[in-house]
Amino acid sequence: MIFKSSRRQLLALLLAAFAPLSFAQGNELSLLNVSYDPTRELYQAFNPEFSRYWKEKTGQSVTVRQSHGGSGKQARSVIDGLDADVVTLALAYDIDAIAEKSGKLPGDWQKRLPHNASPYASTIVFLVRKGNPKGIKDWDDLVKPGVQVITPNPKTSGGARWNYLAAWGYALKKGGSEAAARDYVSRLLKNVPVLDPAARGATNTFVQRGLGDVLLAWENEAFLSINELGPDKFEIVVPSVSILAEPPVAVVDAVARKRGTETVARAYLEYLYSPLGQKLAARHYYRPIKPELADALDVARFPKVNFIRIDDLGGWQAAQKKHFSDGGSFDQIYGR
C-alpha cells in the first residue's frame, strides 16, 4: 500500500510538472485578457480575428476570454491573484503596479513591444447633448455655475485619471502655477454630481440615465455613443487642450508561464500592431499608432488636438503619487 501510494504521488507530481507543457502543445488554448472598461467592443471584434489567424498559422484553436472594469480595479485583481495571461489597461502605472507589487512581469515590460507597448492611443473629449444647450466649448465652461460634469472616480478608473490630468494640465498651462491648477480642478469637482467606478458606468450615467450636461469621455466612448444612439442625440466638443492617452498592453509572464501560454499570449499582443489590428483599432475609434495601416476614412474621423503628454506632468509614477495615491491632490480636494 505504501508503494502504491508513493507511485500515485510520483505520478501526480509528474503530471503537475508537465501540465503547462502539455497545455501549450495541445490543440486547445485559452487566454484571459484583463482589460479596462471601454475596450469591450474592440476586443469583441479583435479576438475572433486573432483566433482565426492563430488557427491558420499553428493549427491550434485559441479562445480569448475577457474581463472588463475600471483599470485600477483590474490591476488590483491581477495583483490579488486573477490569472490574466495578458493585460490591456488604461495607463502604464497600472501595469507598473502589477509588476512592482506581484512580480508577475518584469519592470521593463514596456520595452518588449513597439511604442512603449501602446498599440493605439486616445484622448479626452467632451460629449454634450445635441445643440450643446449649455454652450460648452472649452475647459473654462465646465466650472460655470449650473453645469453638471460627469466623470468617473480616479481612484478606480484609468479614464478618470486621464480626465483629471487633462483638466490639471489645461489649468497649469493657462494659469501658470500649481495653485491655479489646483483651484481649477477644485471648482470642476464641485460640479460633479456622482463618481462612477469606471468609464463605461459614467457613459451610461450620462447617455442612458440622462444625468449631467457634459461627459468627460474617452474619444472612442464619445464616438461610440453617437454611433449607437445617433448624431441627433449627442455631439462631440474638442477642447483647446487635451491629453494624449496611450493605453499599454503586456503579457503577465508568471501566469502565462504557469498556463503554458507564453507564445500565444505574445502573439496576441503583437497582432494588435498588425495591419488588421490597426484597422480594427481605428474602426473602433482608437487612434492607431500606425495610421498608414488603417482605413483612411476611419483615420480621417479623428480631429486635430493640441496635446499635452503625461511626461509634461512628470510621468505616471510622479502623477500617481501626487494626485491619486492616498492623501494626494484628489483626496485633498474631493474630501474637503
Regions found by a protein language model. Give the residues of each.
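N-terminal signal peptide c-region/cleavage motif recognized by signal peptidases
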Residues: A19-L21
